[in-house]
Amino acid sequence: MTLLAPRWLTLSALLALGATTSIGCAPPTDEEAGEEGSSTDDITQIDHTKVKRQSIGNCWIYASASWVEALNKRSTGVEANVSESYWTYWHWFEQLANGRSMTEISTGGSYGTIAGLIDRYGLMLEADFVAAESEAEMSNRQSAALAAINESLKTGALKDPAVRRNRAKVRAELDKAWGLDRTVVGRLDAVFGTGVTKTLDRSYVRNRPNNSIIRARDFDAAIYDFTTNTVKKVKLQDALGTGSYWSRSGPLAFQEVNYPSSAAARRKFQIAVQKSLHASVPVIISWKVDFNALSQSSQFSKEELDRRGPGRQGGHMTVMDDYQVKLSDGRVLKAGEPATADLLTRALDTRATVEFFRVKNSWGAIRPDRWSDAAKPGYHDLLMSYLNGPIKECVERDGHSDPTNCPGSVTPWWDAVLPAGLGNDIGF
Protein backbone atom coordinates (compact mmCIF):
# COMPACT_ATOMS: atom_id res chain seq x y z
CA MET A 1 0.00 0.00 0.00
CA THR A 2 1.10 3.59 -0.44
CA LEU A 3 1.56 5.37 2.85
CA LEU A 4 0.38 8.85 1.92
CA ALA A 5 2.45 11.77 3.19
CA PRO A 6 1.65 15.34 4.19
CA ARG A 7 3.20 17.82 1.79
CA TRP A 8 5.88 18.89 4.29
CA LEU A 9 7.37 15.44 4.19
CA THR A 10 8.55 15.50 0.97
CA LEU A 11 26.25 -10.53 1.71
CA SER A 12 29.51 -14.15 1.03
CA ALA A 13 26.71 -15.74 3.05
CA LEU A 14 26.48 -15.35 6.82
CA LEU A 15 28.06 -18.16 8.74
CA ALA A 16 25.78 -17.76 11.71
CA LEU A 17 22.80 -15.74 12.86
CA GLY A 18 23.36 -12.69 14.99
CA ALA A 19 22.97 -8.96 14.95
CA THR A 20 26.70 -8.39 14.97
CA THR A 21 27.65 -10.76 12.17
CA SER A 22 29.48 -9.27 9.22
CA ILE A 23 27.56 -9.45 5.95
CA GLY A 24 29.40 -10.01 2.70
CA CYS A 25 26.92 -8.83 0.11
CA ALA A 26 25.79 -10.61 -3.02
CA PRO A 27 25.39 -8.15 -5.91
CA PRO A 28 23.81 -9.49 -9.11
CA THR A 29 26.34 -10.58 -11.75
CA ASP A 30 26.05 -8.98 -14.70
CA GLU A 31 -6.54 -2.14 -6.39
CA GLU A 32 -7.90 -0.97 -3.21
CA ALA A 33 -8.57 2.81 -2.99
CA GLY A 34 -8.95 4.79 0.21
CA GLU A 35 -12.45 4.89 1.67
CA GLU A 36 -14.57 7.70 0.30
CA GLY A 37 -14.63 10.69 2.60
CA SER A 38 -11.77 9.41 4.78
CA SER A 39 -8.79 11.67 5.47
CA THR A 40 -5.35 10.38 4.54
CA ASP A 41 -3.39 13.46 5.65
CA ASP A 42 -2.04 11.77 8.78
CA ILE A 43 -0.59 8.78 6.90
CA THR A 44 3.09 9.04 6.00
CA GLN A 45 5.56 7.38 3.69
CA ILE A 46 9.34 7.15 3.47
CA ASP A 47 10.84 9.74 1.17
CA HIS A 48 13.81 7.79 -0.16
CA THR A 49 16.71 9.20 -2.14
CA LYS A 50 17.65 7.88 -5.57
CA VAL A 51 18.55 4.24 -6.17
CA LYS A 52 22.24 3.40 -6.58
CA ARG A 53 24.11 0.34 -7.80
CA GLN A 54 26.90 -1.29 -5.83
CA SER A 55 29.93 -2.47 -7.78
CA ILE A 56 31.47 -4.53 -4.95
CA GLY A 57 30.15 -6.49 -1.96
CA ASN A 58 29.36 -3.53 0.30
CA CYS A 59 25.55 -3.54 0.25
CA TRP A 60 25.55 -2.88 4.00
CA ILE A 61 27.17 0.50 3.35
CA TYR A 62 24.65 1.32 0.61
CA ALA A 63 21.71 0.32 2.82
CA SER A 64 23.08 2.40 5.68
CA ALA A 65 23.63 5.39 3.38
CA SER A 66 20.01 5.13 2.17
CA TRP A 67 18.87 5.03 5.80
CA VAL A 68 20.98 8.08 6.71
CA GLU A 69 19.82 9.99 3.63
CA ALA A 70 16.15 9.27 4.36
CA LEU A 71 16.46 10.48 7.97
CA ASN A 72 18.20 13.62 6.74
CA LYS A 73 15.74 14.29 3.90
CA ARG A 74 12.80 14.10 6.28
CA SER A 75 14.41 16.83 8.37
CA THR A 76 15.72 19.13 5.64
CA GLY A 77 13.64 18.39 2.54
CA VAL A 78 16.93 18.18 0.65
CA GLU A 79 18.31 15.03 -1.02
CA ALA A 80 21.85 14.53 0.26
CA ASN A 81 24.20 12.18 -1.59
CA VAL A 82 26.25 10.59 1.19
CA SER A 83 29.51 9.01 0.05
CA GLU A 84 29.52 5.24 0.34
CA SER A 85 33.10 5.36 -0.94
CA TYR A 86 34.20 7.41 2.08
CA TRP A 87 32.97 4.78 4.54
CA THR A 88 34.40 2.00 2.36
CA TYR A 89 37.81 3.74 2.45
CA TRP A 90 37.84 3.74 6.27
CA HIS A 91 36.50 0.19 6.51
CA TRP A 92 39.48 -0.97 4.49
CA PHE A 93 41.87 1.21 6.47
CA GLU A 94 40.86 -0.44 9.74
CA GLN A 95 41.37 -3.90 8.26
CA LEU A 96 44.78 -3.08 6.86
CA ALA A 97 46.22 -1.00 9.68
CA ASN A 98 46.22 -3.75 12.29
CA GLY A 99 49.04 -5.55 10.48
CA ARG A 100 47.41 -8.99 10.60
CA SER A 101 47.98 -11.51 7.86
CA MET A 102 45.62 -11.09 4.93
CA THR A 103 45.66 -11.63 1.19
CA GLU A 104 42.57 -9.64 0.25
CA ILE A 105 40.17 -7.06 1.66
CA SER A 106 36.87 -8.19 3.14
CA THR A 107 34.03 -6.05 1.83
CA GLY A 108 31.46 -7.40 4.33
CA GLY A 109 30.09 -5.60 7.36
CA SER A 110 26.96 -4.90 9.38
CA TYR A 111 24.92 -2.12 10.95
CA GLY A 112 27.20 -2.28 13.98
CA THR A 113 30.21 -1.83 11.69
CA ILE A 114 28.80 1.26 10.00
CA ALA A 115 27.69 2.81 13.28
CA GLY A 116 31.25 2.52 14.59
CA LEU A 117 32.74 3.94 11.40
CA ILE A 118 30.44 6.96 11.59
CA ASP A 119 31.36 7.45 15.25
CA ARG A 120 35.05 7.57 14.36
CA TYR A 121 35.12 9.20 10.92
CA GLY A 122 31.76 10.90 10.42
CA LEU A 123 30.57 11.20 6.85
CA MET A 124 31.22 13.10 3.64
CA LEU A 125 29.07 13.94 0.67
CA GLU A 126 30.11 12.22 -2.54
CA ALA A 127 30.86 15.54 -4.22
CA ASP A 128 33.49 16.19 -1.54
CA PHE A 129 35.18 12.77 -1.65
CA VAL A 130 35.01 11.41 -5.20
CA ALA A 131 33.61 14.40 -7.06
CA ALA A 132 33.69 12.64 -10.42
CA GLU A 133 31.06 10.17 -9.17
CA SER A 134 28.74 12.63 -7.45
CA GLU A 135 26.01 11.98 -10.04
CA ALA A 136 26.87 8.36 -10.87
CA GLU A 137 24.52 5.47 -10.15
CA MET A 138 27.46 3.05 -9.76
CA SER A 139 30.96 3.66 -8.43
CA ASN A 140 33.65 2.38 -10.76
CA ARG A 141 36.20 3.90 -8.38
CA GLN A 142 35.28 1.38 -5.68
CA SER A 143 35.88 -1.67 -7.87
CA ALA A 144 39.13 -0.21 -9.23
CA ALA A 145 40.35 0.61 -5.72
CA LEU A 146 39.48 -2.88 -4.48
CA ALA A 147 41.48 -4.47 -7.30
CA ALA A 148 44.43 -2.16 -6.60
CA ILE A 149 44.49 -2.85 -2.86
CA ASN A 150 44.17 -6.61 -3.32
CA GLU A 151 47.04 -6.52 -5.81
CA SER A 152 49.13 -4.53 -3.34
CA LEU A 153 48.40 -7.17 -0.69
CA LYS A 154 49.58 -9.91 -3.02
CA THR A 155 52.58 -8.35 -4.75
CA GLY A 156 52.96 -4.74 -3.64
CA ALA A 157 53.74 -2.62 -0.61
CA LEU A 158 50.92 -3.99 1.54
CA LYS A 159 52.30 -7.52 1.29
CA ASP A 160 54.80 -6.51 4.00
CA PRO A 161 53.25 -6.73 7.51
CA ALA A 162 55.55 -3.92 8.64
CA VAL A 163 53.96 -1.60 6.09
CA ARG A 164 50.49 -2.57 7.27
CA ARG A 165 51.50 -1.66 10.81
CA ASN A 166 52.49 1.83 9.61
CA ARG A 167 49.22 3.73 9.49
CA ALA A 168 50.62 6.56 7.39
CA LYS A 169 51.86 4.11 4.75
CA VAL A 170 48.52 2.30 4.75
CA ARG A 171 46.76 5.59 4.16
CA ALA A 172 49.16 6.47 1.36
CA GLU A 173 48.36 3.18 -0.40
CA LEU A 174 44.65 3.78 0.04
CA ASP A 175 44.90 7.35 -1.23
CA LYS A 176 46.68 6.08 -4.33
CA ALA A 177 44.27 3.19 -4.93
CA TRP A 178 41.27 5.48 -4.61
CA GLY A 179 42.82 8.15 -6.81
CA LEU A 180 42.14 10.86 -4.24
CA ASP A 181 43.25 14.33 -5.26
CA ARG A 182 45.49 16.48 -3.08
CA THR A 183 42.59 18.53 -1.77
CA VAL A 184 40.76 15.48 -0.43
CA VAL A 185 43.95 13.97 1.02
CA GLY A 186 44.66 17.30 2.70
CA ARG A 187 41.22 17.30 4.29
CA LEU A 188 41.76 13.83 5.72
CA ASP A 189 45.23 14.79 6.95
CA ALA A 190 43.92 17.92 8.66
CA VAL A 191 41.17 16.12 10.55
CA PHE A 192 42.71 12.71 11.30
CA GLY A 193 46.46 13.15 10.79
CA THR A 194 48.53 11.42 8.13
CA GLY A 195 48.84 8.39 10.42
CA VAL A 196 45.27 8.65 11.72
CA THR A 197 46.29 9.69 15.21
CA LYS A 198 42.89 11.31 15.78
CA THR A 199 39.30 10.18 15.31
CA LEU A 200 36.04 12.04 15.87
CA ASP A 201 34.93 9.94 18.83
CA ARG A 202 37.83 11.01 21.05
CA SER A 203 36.88 13.20 23.99
CA TYR A 204 39.34 15.91 22.98
CA VAL A 205 37.67 16.40 19.58
CA ARG A 206 35.15 19.05 20.60
CA ASN A 207 34.95 21.32 17.57
CA ARG A 208 33.45 20.64 14.18
CA PRO A 209 36.15 19.17 11.93
CA ASN A 210 35.04 21.24 8.89
CA ASN A 211 37.03 20.30 5.76
CA SER A 212 33.78 18.77 4.40
CA ILE A 213 33.92 16.00 7.02
CA ILE A 214 30.69 15.94 9.02
CA ARG A 215 30.22 14.50 12.49
CA ALA A 216 27.03 12.55 13.19
CA ARG A 217 26.19 15.07 15.89
CA ASP A 218 26.15 17.82 13.23
CA PHE A 219 24.11 16.00 10.55
CA ASP A 220 20.38 16.75 10.60
CA ALA A 221 17.85 13.96 10.95
CA ALA A 222 14.18 13.55 11.77
CA ILE A 223 13.03 10.61 13.87
CA TYR A 224 9.59 9.51 14.98
CA ASP A 225 9.55 9.16 18.78
CA PHE A 226 7.27 6.25 19.61
CA THR A 227 7.12 7.23 23.30
CA THR A 228 5.53 10.61 22.51
CA ASN A 229 4.13 9.82 19.05
CA THR A 230 5.78 12.89 17.58
CA VAL A 231 8.37 13.60 14.90
CA LYS A 232 11.53 15.10 16.36
CA LYS A 233 14.16 17.00 14.43
CA VAL A 234 17.42 15.74 15.88
CA LYS A 235 20.88 14.73 14.70
CA LEU A 236 22.11 11.50 13.16
CA GLN A 237 23.98 10.72 16.39
CA ASP A 238 20.63 10.44 18.18
CA ALA A 239 19.56 7.69 15.77
CA LEU A 240 22.91 5.91 16.11
CA GLY A 241 23.16 6.33 19.85
CA THR A 242 26.45 5.54 21.52
CA GLY A 243 28.29 2.38 22.37
CA SER A 244 30.31 -0.30 20.67
CA TYR A 245 30.00 -2.64 17.73
CA TRP A 246 28.05 -5.01 19.97
CA SER A 247 25.35 -2.66 21.28
CA ARG A 248 24.05 0.88 20.91
CA SER A 249 22.22 2.88 23.55
CA GLY A 250 20.29 6.14 23.72
CA PRO A 251 16.65 7.26 24.01
CA LEU A 252 16.26 7.38 20.21
CA ALA A 253 18.90 4.82 19.22
CA PHE A 254 17.96 2.22 16.61
CA GLN A 255 18.62 -1.41 17.53
CA GLU A 256 19.43 -4.48 15.43
CA VAL A 257 16.89 -7.18 16.32
CA ASN A 258 17.00 -10.81 15.17
CA TYR A 259 14.01 -12.29 13.35
CA PRO A 260 12.42 -14.82 15.72
CA SER A 261 11.50 -18.44 15.06
CA SER A 262 7.95 -18.84 16.41
CA ALA A 263 4.93 -17.77 14.36
CA ALA A 264 3.56 -15.54 17.13
CA ALA A 265 6.86 -13.76 17.68
CA ARG A 266 7.36 -13.33 13.95
CA ARG A 267 4.00 -11.60 13.67
CA LYS A 268 5.00 -9.25 16.51
CA PHE A 269 8.25 -8.53 14.68
CA GLN A 270 6.39 -7.80 11.43
CA ILE A 271 4.02 -5.46 13.27
CA ALA A 272 7.00 -3.54 14.64
CA VAL A 273 8.27 -3.11 11.08
CA GLN A 274 4.80 -2.07 9.89
CA LYS A 275 4.56 0.55 12.64
CA SER A 276 7.94 1.91 11.59
CA LEU A 277 6.81 2.26 7.98
CA HIS A 278 3.53 3.88 9.05
CA ALA A 279 5.60 6.47 10.91
CA SER A 280 7.83 7.10 7.87
CA VAL A 281 10.80 5.49 9.60
CA PRO A 282 13.26 3.65 7.31
CA VAL A 283 14.08 0.10 8.42
CA ILE A 284 17.26 -1.72 7.39
CA ILE A 285 16.75 -5.44 6.79
CA SER A 286 19.40 -8.18 6.56
CA TRP A 287 18.46 -11.27 4.59
CA LYS A 288 19.82 -14.19 2.59
CA VAL A 289 19.66 -13.98 -1.18
CA ASP A 290 19.18 -16.93 -3.47
CA PHE A 291 19.14 -15.48 -6.98
CA ASN A 292 17.05 -18.35 -8.30
CA ALA A 293 14.20 -16.95 -6.18
CA LEU A 294 14.24 -13.67 -8.15
CA SER A 295 11.43 -13.55 -10.70
CA GLN A 296 11.18 -11.37 -13.81
CA SER A 297 8.60 -9.30 -11.91
CA SER A 298 11.28 -8.28 -9.38
CA GLN A 299 9.97 -10.49 -6.58
CA PHE A 300 11.84 -12.93 -4.35
CA SER A 301 9.51 -15.91 -4.28
CA LYS A 302 9.75 -19.26 -2.51
CA GLU A 303 7.63 -20.75 -5.29
CA GLU A 304 10.09 -19.52 -7.91
CA LEU A 305 12.98 -20.95 -5.92
CA ASP A 306 11.26 -24.32 -5.49
CA ARG A 307 10.65 -24.45 -9.23
CA ARG A 308 14.24 -23.62 -10.21
CA GLY A 309 16.18 -25.14 -7.33
CA PRO A 310 19.03 -23.48 -5.40
CA GLY A 311 21.21 -20.93 -7.15
CA ARG A 312 23.92 -18.46 -6.21
CA GLN A 313 23.51 -17.34 -2.59
CA GLY A 314 24.82 -14.63 -0.30
CA GLY A 315 23.96 -12.15 2.42
CA HIS A 316 22.30 -8.82 1.67
CA MET A 317 21.16 -5.60 3.35
CA THR A 318 18.47 -3.29 2.00
CA VAL A 319 16.06 -0.62 3.28
CA MET A 320 12.32 -1.18 3.52
CA ASP A 321 9.88 1.06 1.68
CA ASP A 322 6.35 -0.39 1.71
CA TYR A 323 4.37 -3.60 2.13
CA GLN A 324 1.22 -5.44 1.07
CA VAL A 325 -1.13 -7.02 3.59
CA LYS A 326 -4.34 -9.06 3.68
CA LEU A 327 -6.67 -7.95 6.47
CA SER A 328 -8.56 -10.41 8.64
CA ASP A 329 -11.71 -9.89 6.52
CA GLY A 330 -9.82 -10.82 3.34
CA ARG A 331 -9.40 -7.29 2.00
CA VAL A 332 -5.96 -6.67 0.50
CA LEU A 333 -4.18 -3.35 1.01
CA LYS A 334 -1.94 -3.24 -2.02
CA ALA A 335 1.56 -1.84 -2.09
CA GLY A 336 1.67 1.42 -4.01
CA GLU A 337 -2.00 2.28 -3.46
CA PRO A 338 -3.57 4.71 -0.94
CA ALA A 339 -4.64 3.52 2.50
CA THR A 340 -6.40 5.39 5.28
CA ALA A 341 -5.37 5.58 8.92
CA ASP A 342 -8.20 3.22 9.86
CA LEU A 343 -7.08 0.63 7.33
CA LEU A 344 -3.49 0.84 8.50
CA THR A 345 -4.61 0.30 12.08
CA ARG A 346 -6.41 -2.84 10.94
CA ALA A 347 -3.23 -3.90 9.14
CA LEU A 348 -1.55 -4.14 12.56
CA ASP A 349 -3.99 -6.78 13.78
CA THR A 350 -2.29 -10.06 14.64
CA ARG A 351 -4.76 -11.81 12.30
CA ALA A 352 -3.67 -9.72 9.31
CA THR A 353 -1.20 -11.40 6.96
CA VAL A 354 1.66 -9.50 5.36
CA GLU A 355 2.10 -10.76 1.80
CA PHE A 356 5.39 -9.02 1.06
CA PHE A 357 7.69 -6.20 2.08
CA ARG A 358 9.04 -3.89 -0.62
CA VAL A 359 12.68 -2.84 -0.27
CA LYS A 360 14.88 -0.24 -1.87
CA ASN A 361 17.85 -2.16 -3.26
CA SER A 362 21.40 -1.28 -4.34
CA TRP A 363 21.44 -3.17 -7.64
CA GLY A 364 20.55 -0.23 -9.87
CA ALA A 365 17.23 1.15 -11.06
CA ILE A 366 16.90 -0.47 -14.49
CA ARG A 367 18.32 -3.99 -14.89
CA PRO A 368 16.85 -5.81 -17.92
CA ASP A 369 19.59 -8.41 -17.45
CA ARG A 370 18.04 -9.38 -14.11
CA TRP A 371 14.33 -8.50 -14.21
CA SER A 372 11.98 -7.28 -16.90
CA ASP A 373 9.40 -5.54 -14.75
CA ALA A 374 9.26 -3.88 -11.34
CA ALA A 375 6.56 -1.98 -9.47
CA LYS A 376 9.22 0.65 -8.73
CA PRO A 377 12.57 0.78 -10.56
CA GLY A 378 15.32 -0.46 -8.26
CA TYR A 379 12.91 -1.87 -5.66
CA HIS A 380 12.17 -5.54 -4.93
CA ASP A 381 9.26 -7.30 -3.27
CA LEU A 382 10.29 -9.91 -0.70
CA LEU A 383 7.41 -12.35 -0.37
CA MET A 384 6.82 -13.60 3.17
CA SER A 385 6.87 -17.17 1.89
CA TYR A 386 10.49 -16.51 0.92
CA LEU A 387 11.49 -14.49 4.00
CA ASN A 388 10.02 -17.10 6.36
CA GLY A 389 11.52 -19.98 4.42
CA PRO A 390 13.09 -22.26 5.16
CA ILE A 391 15.23 -22.48 2.04
CA LYS A 392 18.16 -24.74 1.27
CA GLU A 393 21.53 -23.39 2.39
CA CYS A 394 24.39 -24.29 0.10
CA VAL A 395 28.03 -24.84 1.03
CA GLU A 396 30.42 -22.06 0.07
CA ARG A 397 33.43 -23.06 -2.02
CA ASP A 398 36.15 -20.66 -3.22
CA GLY A 399 34.03 -17.69 -2.23
CA HIS A 400 30.91 -18.91 -4.06
CA SER A 401 27.99 -21.05 -2.96
CA ASP A 402 27.73 -24.49 -4.54
CA PRO A 403 24.10 -25.11 -5.62
CA THR A 404 24.81 -28.83 -5.94
CA ASN A 405 25.79 -29.14 -2.26
CA CYS A 406 23.04 -27.79 0.01
CA PRO A 407 22.83 -30.01 3.10
CA GLY A 408 21.27 -27.45 5.44
CA SER A 409 18.35 -25.04 5.58
CA VAL A 410 17.97 -21.45 6.75
CA THR A 411 15.37 -18.76 7.36
CA PRO A 412 16.22 -16.00 4.85
CA TRP A 413 15.13 -13.10 7.09
CA TRP A 414 17.95 -12.52 9.56
CA ASP A 415 17.26 -9.24 11.31
CA ALA A 416 16.06 -5.65 11.07
CA VAL A 417 17.29 -2.35 12.49
CA LEU A 418 14.28 -1.02 14.39
CA PRO A 419 13.71 2.41 15.94
CA ALA A 420 13.74 2.91 19.71
CA GLY A 421 10.52 1.82 21.38
CA LEU A 422 9.86 -1.02 18.95
CA GLY A 423 11.29 -4.51 18.91
CA ASN A 424 11.05 -5.05 22.67
CA ASP A 425 9.38 -8.15 24.10
CA ILE A 426 8.92 -9.76 20.70
CA GLY A 427 10.02 -13.19 21.87
CA PHE A 428 11.74 -15.97 19.99
Across the structure, where does each feature detected by a protein language model lie?
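N-terminal Sec signal peptide cleavage junction
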Residues: 23-25
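Bacterial N-terminal signal peptides that target proteins for export
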Residues: 1-12
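Mixed-charge, low-complexity intrinsically disordered regions
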Residues: 231-260, 304-308
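Conserved catalytic-core surface of thiol
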Residues: 335-428
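Processing junctions and N-termini across compartments
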Residues: 18-19, 53
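Active-site nucleophile-adjacent alpha helix/oxyanion-hole segment immediately C-terminal to the catalytic cysteine
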Residues: 37-238, 243, 271-279, 283, ...
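Active-site-adjacent substructure of cysteine-protease-like catalytic cores
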Residues: 158-161, 258-358
